[in-house]
Amino acid sequence: MNKLIVYNTPSWLTAFTTGKGSGVEALGFQLEELALPRQVHSDNVLWMHEAGRPEATDAVITDQPGLPVCVKTADCIPVLLYDTRQRIVAAVHAGWRGTVSRIVQKTVRQMHPLDPKDLHAIIGPGISLQQFEVGDEVYEAFFAAGFPMERIARRFPSSNGKEAWHIDLWDANRFLLQELGVDDIFVEGTCTRTSGDFYSARRETINTGRNYNGIVIKMKSEE
């Protein structure tokens, strides 16, 4: 199996997600050529102008052609952003902690869009509402952070026979983008826990591989 998604985007950029049996090499990149942060479930956002592995960062932004900004996931939600007017791109790692901390909004603000209508978002494969069972403390964290719980949370029967909360991380991040006036939001919709095409920490343990999610501004010669 060689799972690679290349998203439908303007001709001046490439946005992608790699799954099992694939990698950034399929797109002509080497790992050492990426702007790829060492993620810690933070809300830290960093502008990058060259390849590297910055510490304790979960979102990266660039305006440099030829520099892929990437995040790794294995159930968490990847959000890829691009500004069509300024030609700025970003990759965001949004697990539940990052989502509660509104990391996608902090990333958008650091991109300094002239108009939110210029911003476009791709929400890639991640764990679905049906599969993302959480404890009451996670539900309370989203509630305290001002999320619309009637929209993003549901109760489903759990394996112990009781009901448990489930959170829709895709829609939680869509809500955050909509709050800032971003309208063009594409949700890819594949659940990593149920799809064998992608790595899943909940299905395969935390030591499984990782899906790479990236976006790159093409060099002028490639457009």
Regions found by a protein language model. Give the residues of each.
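Active-site microenvironment for binding and transforming phosphate-containing groups
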Residues: 1-223
